[in-house]
């Protein structure tokens, strides 16, 4: 959809830059490290050009035309642009059942072609938004089809949730709830983003007066690049999508993560400022740094993972991370010991001496789902706008199921937020009075 293609093309600009690949696909870099694992994200064509392993899909041609005419438009394989003409009109049912269903087979053909080109396919990365029609409806359709065909491969999504204050469409709560219903069942890891949190970062931290979607996507692409840098560069402590999942997901349904990035600098002012590991760590765990509108201080971390980039001492990284956990022990569940993992990748992003990306599985993410659910219920009680969905062949039952699935998700998060280290409730009452053990 529009959002996913814009974020995705931004991500490829960043990755091309990090690997020294110019807009025509030629290598113009200066370090062997850039080429060592370039094949993870690129296919090498016969004439030595590097072609991204990327597929762009949309139900209308507009956004993809602008990607094609954009700075890196010529680098993508022309066959990998798959689009319809009709648009989904912000309607999940159109994306999932009618318009999207007509286009999905041609998308899957391209997916198969790309998958066959891989020596060892690790998984799929999907960028989409949940508020519109294409990214939410057709995006989740694609995810479920890929899940059918490649059941044992990782499915990682970067999902832009509707924001509490910034709304584009009145039916966002419907589209988002129907999508979450799908993501809970079919995705392995979801990085939750939302525009409002990104706007706040732009205003507060980056001091931008009028942030554009370009600035927001710049933030997202920095995070995406950080999440994937371990796949793309050698490092002292490597990580991949599967290791990430194993370390972050204690219960299969709870795979919605908050992400953060440090150091945050605006596009214009990425000066080479000296950074230290303690500074990075502090900024990375700061709640103002989270790219979704949920406050980690309102919940507890089940697990978290930090990816540091640049030349630094792993010992210092470990010390800082332990330090964070000891100082804020009440924000971590005590029944998962050692629940923060860190990895280090030797290559820093362009223009920075070191950087870090944060991924946290926090129970406070339920705030996002709660908010969407309240808006959903307010409209669904009155059956407002439902005819747009039933007209495409959907049943009200599906709405009810999606609503209860999302409410179940919220209560699961709440249940683990309240859980203590002790077994079944018998000791819980005495437990509350005593100070926590081990943190005195």
From Swiss-Prot:
Keywords: Cytoplasm, Cytoskeleton, GTP-binding, Magnesium, Metal-binding, Microtubule, Nucleotide-binding. One of its GO terms (cellular component) is microtubule. The keyword ATP-binding does not apply. Mg(2+) binds at residue 60. GO terms for molecular function: GTP binding; GTPase activity; metal ion binding; structural constituent of cytoskeleton. Residues 420-440 have a biased composition (Acidic residues). GTP binds at residues 2, 60, 129, 133-135, 195, 217. One of its GO terms (biological process) is microtubule-based process. InterPro entries: Beta_tubulin, Tub_FtsZ_C, Tubulin, Tubulin/FtsZ-like_C, Tubulin/FtsZ_2-layer-sand-dom, Tubulin/FtsZ_GTPase_sf, Tubulin_C, Tubulin_CS. It is found in: Cytoplasm, Cytoskeleton. It comes from the Eukaryota. Its cofactor is Mg(2+). Residues 411-440 are annotated as: Disordered. Tubulin is the major constituent of microtubules, a cylinder consisting of laterally associated linear protofilaments composed of alpha- and beta-tubulin heterodimers. Microtubules grow by the addition of GTP-tubulin dimers to the microtubule end, where a stabilizing cap forms. Below the cap, tubulin dimers are in GDP-bound state, owing to GTPase activity of alpha-tubulin. Belongs to the tubulin family. Dimer of alpha and beta chains. A typical microtubule is a hollow water-filled tube with an outer diameter of 25 nm and an inner diameter of 15 nM. Alpha-beta heterodimers associate head-to-tail to form protofilaments running lengthwise along the microtubule wall with the beta-tubulin subunit facing the microtubule plus end conferring a structural polarity. Microtubules usually have 13 protofilaments but different protofilament numbers can be found in some organisms and specialized cells. PANTHER family: TUBULIN. This is Tubulin beta-3 chain. It comes from Pisum sativum. The gene is TUBB3.
């Amino acid at each position: 959809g529009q959002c996913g293609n814009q974020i995705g093309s931004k991500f490829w600009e960043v990755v091309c830059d990090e690997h020294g690949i110019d807009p025509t696909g030629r290598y113009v870099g200066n370090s062997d490290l850039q080429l060592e694992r370039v094949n993870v994200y690129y296919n090498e064509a016969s004439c030595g050009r590097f072609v991204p392993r990327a597929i762009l899909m949309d139900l209308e041609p507009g956004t993809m035309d602008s990607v094609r005419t954009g700075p890196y438009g010529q680098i993508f394989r022309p066959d990998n642009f798959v689009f319809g003409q009709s648009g989904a009109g912000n309607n999940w049912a159109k994306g999932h059942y009618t318009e999207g269903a007509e286009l999905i087979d041609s998308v899957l053909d391209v997916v198969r072609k790309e998958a066959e080109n891989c020596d060892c396919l690790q998984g799929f990365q999907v960028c989409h938004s949940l508020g519109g029609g294409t990214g939410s409806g057709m995006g989740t359709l694609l995810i479920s089809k890929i899940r059918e065909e490649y059941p044992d491969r990782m499915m990682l999504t970067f999902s832009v949730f509707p924001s509490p204050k910034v709304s584009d469409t009145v039916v966002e709560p419907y589209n988002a709830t129907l999508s979450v219903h799908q993501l809970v069942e079919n995705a392995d890891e979801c990085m939750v983003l939302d525009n409002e949190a990104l706007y706040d970062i732009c205003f507060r931290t980056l001091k931008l007066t009028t942030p554009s979607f370009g600035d927001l996507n710049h933030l997202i692409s920095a995070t995406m690049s950080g999440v994937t840098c371990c796949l793309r560069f050698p490092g002292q402590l490597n990580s991949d999508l599967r290791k990430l999942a194993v370390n972050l997901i204690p219960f299969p349904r709870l795979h919605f993560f908050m992400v953060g990035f440090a150091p945050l600098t605006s596009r214009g002012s990425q000066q080479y400022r000296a950074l230290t590991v303690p500074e990075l760590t502090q900024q990375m765990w700061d709640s103002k740094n989270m790219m979704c509108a949920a406050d980690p201080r309102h919940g507890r971390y089940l697990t978290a993972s930090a990816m540091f980039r640049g030349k630094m001492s792993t010992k210092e990284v470990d010390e800082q991370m332990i330090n964070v956990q000891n100082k804020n022990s009440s924000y971590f569940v005590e029944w998962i010991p050692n629940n923060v993992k860190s990895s280090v990748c030797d290559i820093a992003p362009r223009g920075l001496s070191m950087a870090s990306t944060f991924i946290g599985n926090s129970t406070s993410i339920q705030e996002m789902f709660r908010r969407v659910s309240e808006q959903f219920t307010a409209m669904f009680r009155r059956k407002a706008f439902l005819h747009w969905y039933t007209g495409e062949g959907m049943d009200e039952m599906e709405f009810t199921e999606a609503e209860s699935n999302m409410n179940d998700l919220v209560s699961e998060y709440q249940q683990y937020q309240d859980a203590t280290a002790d077994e079944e409730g018998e000791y819980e009452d005495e437990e509350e009075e005593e100070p926590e053990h081990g943190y005195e």
